[in-house]
Design a protein with these regions (language model features):
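Ubiquitin-like/PB1-type beta-grasp interaction modules and other compact soluble beta-rich domains
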Residues: 1-92
Length: 92
């Protein structure tokens, strides 16, 4: 599975815009995050807060934010589009 990462998360995975993870049938968002953090431990402090997805992080599965679906228990369907966004600011 390809996971796309944005902004300040990219340096934590060696500057890559996306990473490949091994996933199987029935894997959940929690499984995916565990795999990400196993490969790139620096992501842990950015992605998690008290054992859940940080309130500052937005994880989108097929264009919908997982926090408003089944959260960490959401099963990842085959050929899913998964994107993780950190907080982004800007403007004048």
């Amino acid at each position: 599975m390809k996971v796309k990462l944005y902004a300040s998360l990219r340096p934590l995975v060696g500057g890559q815009t996306s990473v490949e993870l091994e996933t199987g049938p029935g894997d959940t968002i929690q499984d995916m995050l565990d795999e990400l953090m196993k490969k790139w431990p620096a992501l842990r402090d950015e992605l998690l807060e008290n054992g859940d997805i940080s309130s500052r992080i937005h994880v989108f599965l097929n264009g919908r934010e997982v926090r408003y679906m089944d959260g960490l228990d959401m099963v990842i369907p085959e050929n899913a589009d998964l994107r993780i966004f950190p907080p982004v600011g800007g403007g004048a």
